[in-house]
């Protein structure tokens, strides 16, 4: 009798589970499994992430370089007494990065610091390398070109105001493009540092220009979006978008995404800047990241991950994750995953549940 009672209770329990999963719309399914996780927990806020060999790296508020390589333990190196917010650049095993005291470092994990140079103010933007020179901007209003081997300054360019952005290379013409807080987009020779031209957007340019299919897209703080031919620096169009733009534009397929500090996002046609769609999100959106031509992600300051998907000639928007932590930096695409630094020094990984 006891065995029969146990069997009956077991069957009743199975029946209740079946009823629960069929009737409860919120019951967990494969598609609703958690798609994000905390992959690194640090004690100091991280700066922007940068690619490092087959992994990535970041510097933190304690002056450390932290390297994450696939299948290996996380490595930490002390490279400065000051905090970092700029992304590290790795080339041939050497890391180039500027700190918030204005010191630009060339560092080898095997050999230590190779050279450094103190600029006149903090460095918050990333560096680029071309033919043995590393270029980086500083808040002291200057773009520097250092020899990668020696740290010797070969060129310096007056940018009129502080530089927050990373330069963008256009190798076919051996030029670079850089925005500055004096509101001007500059075209500069990679051969000798000569200023080849400038376009005035009339308000500070807080972030990087974006180069896509031979066109340079630049966004000012007041929301002026300018598209320029990289080959000859001719302006294609100029449109007013949003005010309070701290993030760079983001290219996805035939569209340019812009976001404002007031929580507004726009999709505009890449060809002419014409407005396609607008979303009022109610929270500040950090730098967006495109995944292919049909998906854009952006994390908010409150830690919500927003997604825009293009289908049937229309963009749709949804919130795919709530990290429940503050975030001040944008998303970074690493393979098929998104990496998002949070305010506390952690790194969150988001992966589509059913790609």
PLM-predicted stretches and their roles:
Residues 4-15, 19-355:
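Extracytoplasmic/lumenal domain signature
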């Amino acid at each position: 009798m006891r065995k029969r009672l146990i069997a009956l209770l077991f069957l009743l329990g199975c029946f209740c589970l079946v009823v629960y999963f069929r009737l409860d719309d919120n019951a967990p399914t494969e598609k609703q499994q958690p798609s994000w996780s905390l992959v690194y927990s640090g004690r100091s806020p991280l700066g922007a992430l940068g690619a490092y060999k087959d992994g990535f790296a970041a510097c933190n508020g304690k002056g450390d370089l932290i390297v994450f390589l696939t299948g290996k333990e996380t490595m930490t190196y002390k490279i400065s007494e000051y905090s970092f917010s700029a992304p590290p650049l790795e080339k041939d095993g050497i890391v180039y990065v500027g700190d918030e005291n204005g010191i630009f470092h060339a560092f080898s994990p095997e050999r230590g610091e190779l050279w450094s140079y103190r600029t006149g103010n903090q460095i918050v933007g990333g560096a680029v390398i071309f033919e043995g020179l590393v270029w980086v901007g500083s808040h002291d209003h200057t773009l520097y070109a250092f020899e990668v081997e020696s740290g010797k300054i070969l060129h310096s360019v007056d940018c009129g105001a502080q530089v927050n952005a990373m330069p963008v290379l256009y190798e076919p013409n051996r030029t670079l493009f850089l925005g500055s807080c004096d509101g001007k987009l500059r075209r500069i020779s990679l051969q000798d540092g000569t200023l080849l031209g400038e376009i005035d957007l009339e308000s500070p340019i807080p972030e990087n220009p974006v180069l896509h299919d031979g066109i340079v897209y630049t966004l000012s703080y007041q929301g002026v979006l300018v598209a320029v031919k990289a080959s000859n620096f001719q302006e294609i169009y100029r449109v007013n978008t949003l005010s309070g733009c701290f993030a760079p534009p983001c290219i996805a397929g035939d569209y340019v995404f812009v976001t404002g500090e007031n929580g507004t996002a726009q999709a505009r046609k890449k060809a002419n800047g014409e407005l396609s769609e607008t979303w009022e999100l109610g929270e500040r959106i950090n730098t967006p990241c495109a995944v292919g031509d049909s998906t854009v992600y952006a994390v908010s300051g409150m830690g919500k991950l927003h997604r825009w998907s293009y289908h049937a000639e229309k963009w749709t928007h949804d919130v795919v994750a709530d990290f429940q932590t503050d975030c001040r930096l944008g998303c970074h695409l690493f393979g098929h995953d998104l990496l998002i630094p949070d305010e506390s020094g952690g790194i969150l990984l988001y992966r589509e549940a059913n790609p």
